[in-house]
Amino acid sequence: MSVYRCFVEKKQPFATEANGVKSDLKIALLNDNVNNVRVINRYDLENIDEEDFKMAERTILSEPQVDALYEQAPVAEDDEWVLAVEYLPGQFDQRADSASQCIQLATMKEKPEVRSARLYYIKGNLTEEDKEKIKKTLINPVEAREASLEKPETIHQNYEKPALPEILNGFIDLDEAGLEAFR
């Protein structure tokens, strides 16, 4: 199956998160180089048919009254810089999990695989130093990373099965000399 992708952005005046990010970035940069910020949620879905995807993007992934829905990422203007942020593999993505569960309930079919990312369209006269500060402000390296803007062939992730840990027999019975030798 192929990967379906859509982009969802809050319309003005509902884009309160984008306004908050703009304020945070102005404080972090200690300058007025940021003129505007747009926050766009990106959804990648797999194991879903096109009809169900079309239904989901209009009823689950977006709210037509307050959201603008795009099939392709909006093109950045000349003075706009785009930063995409996604959760690290293994980190729980509540937005994606909630979307997946809702789609399964709505379609009464197999649960689709969903990945989400957040795209920040930052408009202004930004230096490379500003961009690095913005990355440090918007990306918590413990849980997230910079995401690719390219559409993947698949969103399914395979992980190697880790080796079993070594079993230490008699460890609990070691005295101080035994613990020192074990070190």
Residue ranges of each PLM-predicted region?
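Core nucleic-acid recognition elements
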Residues: 1-183
